[in-house]
């Protein structure tokens, strides 16, 4: 199932791999930035990859923070889909890439890890020197009073509030919806969203939606790590989201080398000292 979400790539070139390894190896304070591509081998699709990305394969569009806060229909669409996809997401396990970076950390092979992912797989693999730039989807937070509960606890509340909803879309014997399946228009109508247990406010997965401000403390940490590092390695990100791109651009403006591993173009290709269009696991196995 995991391979379903991994984009097609070209055959490995041993000389390119050796050169890449040699160049990255000269950086003693390496800042690593990971994106959705590092988790595709765990069965979690990315967004923009040709033929397999969620935004390229389906009619799915990102939900904007302002719409989420203003529109009940938008919140119903967000939570109904999250409810149906949660079992698959919750069961996702770290893959070779996550464990490799955890081992790199233990061996002091890099300075810091910034992930744009919200799947928590780096933490599950044992990473500790990490900033989850866009939050963590394994918990849910009130937008009014900062009350927090686990995503699984909230799933239980969603399940209780919406008896029979899952059975409309998930076939008997099937535990969850395919990650790239779009719900029919209007199917979210009537979906009930439990309120905050503390103040009755709106509950939202503890992730940064499009149009939402990033956590200022995390921004400061990332800026500090860029200043401290002397090179950047990006893994599995197109850097289309501005927050990730700005980190790389910040390092580039300081004349620090940029190394990229991503299947397909990225926003920072022109900045790259060297780029490989290979599967991340194939590269990390050689490093």
Swiss-Prot record:
EC category name: transferase
Its EC number(s): 2.3.1.286
Gene3D superfamilies: SIR2/SIRT2 'Small Domain, TPP-binding domain
Positions contributing to NAD(+) binding: 35-55, 116-119, 236-238, 262-264, 280
Subcellular locations according to the entry: Mitochondrion matrix; Mitochondrion
Binding positions (Zn(2+)): 142, 145, 196, 199
Pfam families named among the record's database cross-references: SIR2
Distribution of this protein across tissues and organs: Ubiquitously expressed with high expression in the pharynx, body wall muscles and gonad. Strong expression in a subset of non-neuronal cells in the head.
Cofactor: binding details: Binds 1 zinc ion per subunit.
The reaction(s) this protein catalyses: N(6)-acetyl-L-lysyl-[protein] + NAD(+) + H2O = 2''-O-acetyl-ADP-D-ribose + nicotinamide + L-lysyl-[protein]
GO molecular function: histone deacetylase activity, NAD-dependent; NAD+ binding; zinc ion binding
Active site: residue positions: 134 (proton acceptor)
PANTHER family: NAD-DEPENDENT PROTEIN DEACYLASE SIRTUIN-5, MITOCHONDRIAL-RELATED
Purpose: NAD-dependent protein deacylase. Catalyzes the NAD-dependent hydrolysis of acyl groups from lysine residues. Plays a role in oxidative stress resistance. Might promote neuronal cell death under ischemic conditions and cell death in touch neurons induced by mec-4 channel hyperactivation, possibly downstream of the insulin-like receptor daf-2. Might attenuate the reactive oxygen species (ROS) scavenging system, that eliminates ROS in ischemic conditions, under dietary deprivation and when glycolysis is blocked.
Note: This protein may be expected to contain an N-terminal transit peptide but none has been predicted.
Family according to the record: Belongs to the sirtuin family. Class II subfamily.
Protein's name according to its UniProt entry: NAD-dependent protein deacylase sir-2.3
């Amino acid at each position: 199932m995991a391979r379903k979400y991994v984009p097609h790539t070209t055959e490995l070139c041993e000389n390119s791999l050796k050169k890449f390894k040699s160049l990255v190896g000269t950086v003693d304070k390496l800042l690593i930035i990971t994106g959705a591509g590092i988790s595709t081998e765990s069965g979690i699709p990315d967004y923009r990859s040709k033929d397999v990305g969620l935004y390229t394969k389906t009619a799915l569009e990102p939900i904007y923070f302002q719409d989420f806060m203003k529109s009940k229909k938008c919140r119903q669409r967000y939570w109904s889909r999250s409810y149906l996809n949660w079992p698959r997401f919750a069961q996702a396990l770290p893959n070779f890439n996550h464990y490799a970076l955890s081992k790199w950390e233990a061996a002091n092979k890099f300075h810091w890890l910034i992930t744009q992912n919200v799947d928590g797989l780096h933490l599950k693999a044992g990473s500790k020197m990490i900033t989850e730039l866009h939050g963590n989807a394994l918990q849910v937070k009130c937008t009014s009073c900062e009350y927090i509960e686990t995503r699984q606890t909230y799933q239980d509340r969603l399940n209780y509030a919406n008896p029979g909803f899952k059975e409309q879309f998930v076939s008997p014997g099937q535990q969850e919806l395919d990650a790239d399946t779009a719900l029919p228009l209007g199917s979210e109508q009537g979906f009930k969203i439990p309120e905050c247990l503390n103040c009755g406010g709106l509950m939202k997965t503890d992730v940064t939606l499009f149009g939402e401000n990033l956590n200022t403390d995390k921004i400061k940490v990332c800026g500090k790590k860029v200043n401290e590092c002397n090179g950047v390695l990006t893994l599995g990100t197109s850097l289309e989201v501005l927050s990730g791109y700005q980190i790389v651009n910040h390092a580039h403006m300081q004349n620090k080398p940029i190394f990229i591993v991503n299947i397909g173009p990225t926003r920072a290709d022109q900045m790259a000292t060297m780029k490989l269009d290979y599967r991340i696991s194939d590269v990390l196995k050689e490093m």
